[in-house]
Structure formats: C-alpha cells, structure tokens
C-alpha cells in the first residue's frame, strides 16, 4: 500500500511553495503521496508561520489534535517545519514530546535523512540550521498540477524591520543562481505551466549569480526579462516586494515586458512617516507614492494590493488618519491588514504600547470596510468589459463550470460545456464580465468565429 503524507500549511506563499517541496522530497525518497486527510497519513507535517502570535499558537493547538492519531498509530511520524520550528527548535519537542521531527525552512530537503535517523535512534530529530541556499541543490524536479506555479528565487530578508521575525527565522537574503531559477521555470513550462509567481520575502532585492560560482550578477529586472523569454510562459507575477528595492531598472521592465501582469503587491505597512520610521521600513510615504505614480504612468490599469499593520506601538488617531488617507489615494484593490502582534526577540516588542485593544480593533474594522468598498467598486467597474483570463480548472462553486484569473488577480467563474473543459484548462481566453460578487466575478466566453464550434463540442 502506498504510504501517504499530510501537510498543513500556515502563512505566506513561500510556505505554500515549501510545502509542495516537502511532498516532492518525500515522494522522490520514499514514494509517499500527498493526502488531504490526516487520518490516512503515515507522516503528518505542519509548515508553520510565526509572523503573528495567533498563527503560532494555532500550531500547538493542531498538534494536540493529532496526538490521538499517534496514540492509535504508533508508527505515525509527526513533524513541525517552517518559521515556528526555526524559532522554537527543540523546545517544541519539550512541549509536545510526541513530535518526531523539527526542521527549519532551509533544511526541508533533509527530511528523508531525518526520518531515517528518527526510525533508527527512536529519538526526535531537530535541524534548524541555516545552510545558506543548499536546499535548492537537493530538491527533486517540481511536480505540478494546473497551469500556475510558484518559484522561489531567494530566501531570507536583510531588512530587519523592527516588528518582523522573518530575518531571525529564515536568515539573511540569499539569491538562487539565475540559471538555476530559469531551469526550474523551463521545467514547469514543459509540464504545461503558463503562469509563474516568483517568490521571496523581499523578492525585488534578488541579486543572483548568472551561474553557480560566477562573479557576474543578475538583478531582479534581468531575471524577469529572461523568464519572459521562456517558451510557454504567458504571465509573470511576483511577491512580496519592498518599496526600497523598486529600482529604475524594475520600472523599465514594466514598459518592456507585457507578460508582467498589471497587478502589484507592494506592502506599505503604514501611512505615517513617524510610524514607518519606528518600523525601520527605510522609506517615507512620499517615496512610496512616487513609486506608484511612476508605475501607473507606465501601466495606467495597474491594480495594487498591500499589507497594513494597525495599532503599532505609539500609533495615534492622527497616524491612523494618515493611513486611511493613503488607502483612499492609492485605491488599493486588496489589503492584508492585521492588528500589530509583538514577536519575541524583535526590537518593537520592547516598545511601550498603551493603545487599548478595543481601539485597535475599531481602527482595523474601519480600514477593512474601506478596502472592501474599494474591492466592490473595482469589481463593478469591470462589468461589461472583456478580460483575458488564464483558465485554472473547475470552479470551486460549481465543478461543472470553469474558473480562471484575471491580470488583476480576480477569480472569474464561467459556464463551459464539460467536453470543452480539458481543452480550455491552461489556456488564455477572453471572457465578458457580467456579474460582480464580493470576492469573485462571473463571465461568459468570448470566442472568435473559428473557436465557437470547438469550445462547444
């Protein structure tokens, strides 16, 4: 019987990418297949996030639930990876003795060896070292399902924002060699991938050697240009970027590379220069707005999303009002917004914070309601327009329909004959938007005369 692995992912797209790699590594080493049911698994892995306290505590809550599975199946292996593992290390085993494996984001490629050591010794294995970017040299070729894929181009972050734990859990910035990234993207294109999302904690800080050992360095703009030249790749996205790393070279790429989508996720974190300075973000609101102004001069239809922290220590009503003014001015399409969560070991955790929780919550609700109004307005503005979408697969709402994604990252559900589904999935097609919902759109196929009969048979 084929053994199975269950992976639960917390946090960002980097973690989603790493979770896929965990499955690939275990499939190559032991033939394990992925399952969505922990009860069916021989190995259960939690890929964790420590950006906010709530996500960290959720991990231990979930560990408590799978403890019963281990009691019923003693050979079941339980592992904790990701940023909580990197931060907590062996203390995870002390708190949850039934955990067998603890590994950091940089050591997931060592899972097969850790599993062997656990089985031979009977003792929990902990490896949370930072072996630079070694893991990419030991990962098997990606196995993908669907026309979209993530590609990690770098690890870590060297910005050391005062509130952020990432540099401590993932290390400083290290970029993959250019040829290594291009080889992975070309392999994905050969498997039918049409859209890639380039990933990094600070992705536009990419500075990769042209090839391993080479002294010649490629910047992020160069990487995008090369990826755009790979046959089969029709769309390029990236996340997460930093305003301080938005170079003129990167701005120029938006004018030269149409495959780079009209959508940008550029975290601002706050609208007050005073708070940005306390956060150690390294830019002012005016500098941030200057980047967006230049981008929108090149791409007038640019859709913009961001991250915003509410209730950072010392935030006043005036500071929050500046954030709201920026939200209105930028017309953000989406915002990942949260109440500030102090993380142990970060400088901001030592700042005095006398703002009542109720006031922070009120500010957050006001911010999120405003963003939702923006989302609704932008969705309504798309009614009647023809949008180019990449068809990703059956709709989650109705498997008899198909779903795709627009350049500005909107999901569009549309009817199509079942017989046409295999032909349409993975294709770039035109749809006319005829309904707007809070978090999705509905459309209908727009076909040239010669395509009409093929799509309906």
From Swiss-Prot:
* Subunit relationships: Monomer.
The protein in question is named tRNA-2-methylthio-N(6)-dimethylallyladenosine synthase
Function statement:
Catalyzes the methylthiolation of N6-(dimethylallyl)adenosine (i(6)A), leading to the formation of 2-methylthio-N6-(dimethylallyl)adenosine (ms(2)i(6)A) at position 37 in tRNAs that read codons beginning with uridine.
Cofactor(s) in the UniProt record:
[4Fe-4S] cluster
PANTHER family this protein is in? CDK5 REGULATORY SUBUNIT-ASSOCIATED PROTEIN 1, MITOCHONDRIAL TRNA METHYLTHIOTRANSFERASE CDK5RAP1
Does the keyword Lyase feature in the UniProt annotation? Answer: no
**InterPro entries per record:** Elp3/MiaA/NifB-like_rSAM, Methylthiotransferase, Methylthiotransferase_CS, Methylthiotransferase_N, Methylthiotransferase_N_sf, MiaB_methiolase, rSAM, rSAM_horseshoe
Q: Name one GO cellular component term.
A: cytosol
Binding site residues for [4Fe-4S] cluster 1: 12, 49, 83
Q: Which PROSITE patterns match?
A: MTTASE_N, MTTASE_RADICAL, RADICAL_SAM, TRAM
Residue sites binding [4Fe-4S] cluster 2 per the record: 157, 161, 164
Coiled-coil stretches: none
Q: Which GO terms describe its molecular function?
A: 4 iron, 4 sulfur cluster binding; metal ion binding; N6-isopentenyladenosine methylthiotransferase activity
């Amino acid at each position: 019987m084929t053994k199975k692995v269950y992976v639960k992912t917390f946090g960002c797209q980097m973690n989603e990418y790493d979770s896929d790699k965990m499955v690939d590594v275990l499939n190559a080493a032991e033939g394990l297949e992925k399952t969505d049911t922990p009860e069916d698994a021989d190995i259960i892995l939690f890929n964790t996030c420590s950006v906010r306290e709530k996500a960290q505590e959720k991990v231990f809550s979930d560990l408590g639930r799978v403890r019963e599975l281990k009691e019923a199946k003693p050979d079941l292996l339980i592992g904790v990876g990701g940023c909580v593992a990197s931060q907590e290390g062996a203390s995870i085993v002390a708190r949850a003795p039934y955990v067998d494996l603890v590994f950091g984001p940089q050591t997931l490629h060592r899972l097969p060896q850790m599993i062997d050591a656990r089985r031979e010794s009977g003792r929990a294995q902990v490896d949370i070292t930072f072996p630079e970017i070694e893991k990419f040299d030991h990962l098997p070729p990606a196995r993908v399902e669907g026309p979209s894929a993530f590609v990690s181009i770098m690890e870590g972050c060297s910005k050391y924002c005062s509130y952020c734990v990432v540099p401590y859990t993932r290390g400083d910035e290290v970029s993959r060699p250019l040829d290594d990234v291009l080889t992975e993207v070309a392999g994905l294109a050969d498997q039918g991938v049409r859209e890639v999302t380039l990933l990094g904690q600070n992705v536009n800080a990419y500075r990769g050697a042209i090839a391993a050992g080479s002294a010649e360095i490629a910047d992020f703009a160069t990487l995008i240009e090369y990826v755009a030249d790979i046959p089969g790749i029709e769309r390029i996205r990236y996340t997460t970027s930093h305003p301080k790393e938005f170079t003129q070279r990167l701005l120029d790429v938006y004018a030269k590379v149409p495959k780079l989508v009209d959508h940008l996720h550029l975290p601002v974190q706050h609208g007050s220069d005073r708070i940005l300075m306390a956060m150690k973000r390294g830019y002012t609101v005016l500098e941030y707005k200057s980047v967006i102004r230049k981008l929108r001069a090149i791409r007038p239809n640019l859709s913009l999303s961001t991250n915003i922290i509410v209730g950072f220590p010392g935030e006043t009503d005036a500071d929050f009002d500046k954030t709201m003014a920026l939200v209105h001015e930028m017309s953000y399409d989406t915002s990942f917004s949260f109440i500030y969560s102090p993380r142990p070991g970060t400088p901001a955790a030592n700042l005095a914070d006398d703002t009542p929780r109720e006031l922070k919550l009120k500010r957050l609700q006001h911010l999120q309601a405003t963003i939702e109004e923006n989302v609704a307005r932008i969705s309504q503005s798309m009614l009647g327009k023809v949008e180019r979408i990449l068809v990703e697969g059956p709709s989650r709402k109705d498997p008899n329909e198909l779903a795709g994604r627009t350049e500005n990252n909107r999901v569009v559900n549309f009817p199509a004959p079942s017989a046409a589904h295999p032909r349409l999935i993975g294709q770039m097609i035109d749809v006319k938007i005829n309904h707007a919902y809070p978090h999705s759109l509905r459309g209908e196929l727009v076909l040239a005369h010669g395509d009409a009969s093929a799509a309906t048979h």
